[in-house]
Swiss-Prot record:
One of its GO terms (biological process) is response to toxic substance. GO terms for molecular function: flavonol-3-O-beta-glucoside O-malonyltransferase activity; malonyltransferase activity. It comes from Nicotiana tabacum (Common tobacco). This is Phenolic glucoside malonyltransferase 1. Monomer. The HXXXXD motif is essential for acyltransferase activity. Its EC number is 2.3.1.-, 2.3.1.116.
Length: 453
């Protein structure tokens, strides 16, 4: 559990713009009904409560306020028309703020940062819920970001983030976190804030010659009864586990695939890692005792940053969502067999390869239809990316000891988190949330398979 020390609202620092409104693009609309994103960073820092209250809390509030001067929409709200007659938008006005909770916990810090299976419910004490939406003339206003900082006396600190995906994708949120970390580490000296952390807000760079925005918005309105502006969370009865796949093992997996399929052209660290996890997940299902349909379809889905796929490319610091989805699918029996891993690599690689530089495909909106025939309960999806390095977020206390993607706990299917390893360049860190039985079976297969490479 966590007891509250202080709950406050942090506003952007003086000198910030008085208002900012960003229309949602078709890249944003698709996330309106999506569950909230939750991440926790754990830092080893052996400090006492008095030090936490007297030094850590004031500096974090000051640096967050300064960071929000650059990231105004995160202090604002998503404004959704109550009659659904117009597009939603991100809206900031003077006085808007981010809810921040400072708390203290006596839970075992070393247990939480472990790699072994841990109860998923334990982590929800350290991520905040977004405040309830409020009615305003003609619209409903829902906050898009909340933060919780928790002290584990004489052991460490965690920083939990909850955000509405409609505000921005992983690239946007990670840049915000790293900007905050830099300003906190260097005492608010803005000269340390490199251009890559200064958001680009011009939404006119998102081209829409085919009216994709209207098409997707009309499609999303069909599901408005499913869109909950409230942040409702029920922690599932699962365990969380973390697995490391080394650069050396990734190289062996690539060689294994290319020995069997020498003509494959998109064999990357991402494709072999995801394919290996996918096949281990499929094979672990037998341990649950549930009936398995060998001819049933299995799905793999991932979202990729498409900023560089436009002509001209969007700025890397573009604020918002710029993701397109890739889907691979095949029968259960194909993945469970001896050639399952190779088949998975080929399917995932081909799904990405044929679309990775296809601006026309993006502008046609076809990527939105990729998920139409996906059975969510038979799917594995990916959260995070090795390209987004939250382990680089140093608030002045050193690199994080552990990163947890709490939002992979959803019950619709199985999600895996994927990030750089904190300890070694080229190694990847995989997070999973499964039933205890399934996790044990997965861990055995994951370890056994790697040992025979």
């Amino acid at each position: 559990m966590a007891s509250v020390i202080e709950q406050c609202q942090v506003v952007p620092s003086p000198g910030s713009a008085t208002e900012l409104t960003l229309p949602l693009t078709y890249f944003d609309h698709v996330w309106l009904a999506f569950h909230r994103m939750r991440r926790i960073l754990f830092y080893k820092l052996p400090i006492s409560r008095p030090d936490f209250v007297q030094t850590i809390i004031p500096t974090l509030k000051d640096s967050l306020s300064l960071t929000l001067k650059y990231y105004l929409p995160l202090a604002g709200n998503v404004a959704c028309p109550q009659d659904w007659s117009g597009y939603p938008e991100l809206r900031y006005v003077t006085g808007n703020s981010v809810s921040v909770i400072f708390s203290e916990s006596d839970m075992d810090f070393n247990y939480l940062i472990g790699y072994h299976p841990r109860n998923t419910k334990d982590f929800y004490h350290f991520v905040p819920q977004l405040a309830e939406p409020k009615d305003a003339p003609g619209v409903q206003l829902a906050p898009v970001l909340a933060i919780q900082v928790t002290l584990f006396p004489n052991h460490g600190i965690s920083i939990g983030f909850t955000n509405h995906h409609v505000a921005g994708d992983g690239a946007t949120i990670v840049k915000f976190v790293r900007a905050w970390a830099l300003l906190n580490k260097f005492g608010g000296d803005e000269q340390f804030l490199a251009n890559e952390f200064i958001p680009f807000y011009d939404r006119s760079v998102i081209k829409d010659p085919n009216g994709v925005g209207m098409s997707i918005w009309n499609e999303m309105k069909k599901y408005k009864h499913m869109m909950k502006m409230s942040d409702v969370v029920t922690p599932p009865d699962k365990v969380r586990g973390t697995f490391i796949i080394t650069r050396h093992d990734i190289g062996k997996l690539k060689n294994l695939v290319l020995t069997r399929r020498p003509k494959l052209t998109h064999v990357t660290s991402f494709t072999v890692t995801c394919a290996y996890v996918w096949t281990c997940i499929i094979k672990s299902e037998a341990a649950t005792g549930e009936e398995i349909d060998e001819n049933g379809m299995e799905f793999f889905g991932c979202a990729a940053d498409c900023r560089a796929q436009f002509n001209p490319p969007l700025p890397p610091s573009y604020f918002g969502n710029a993701l397109v989805g890739y889907v691979a699918r095949t029968r259960q029996v194909d993945l469970a067999g001896k050639e399952g891993f190779t088949i998975a690599v080929e399917l995932i690689g081909e799904a990405i390869r044929k679309r990775m530089k296809d601006e026309e495909w993006i502008l046609s909106g076809s990527w939105f239809k990729e998920y139409d025939k996906v059975d969510a309960k038979r799917s594995l999806s990916v959260a995070g990316s090795p390209k987004l390095d939250l382990y680089a977020a140093d608030f002045g206390w050193g690199r994080p000891e552990k990163l947890e993607f709490v939002s992979i706990d959803n019950d619709d299917g199985i999600s895996m988190s994927l990030s750089k390893s904190k300890d070694s360049d080229g190694d990847l860190e995989i997070g999973l949330s499964l039933s205890k039985t399934r996790m044990n079976a997965f861990a055995a297969m994951f370890t056994h398979g790697i040992s025979f490479l």
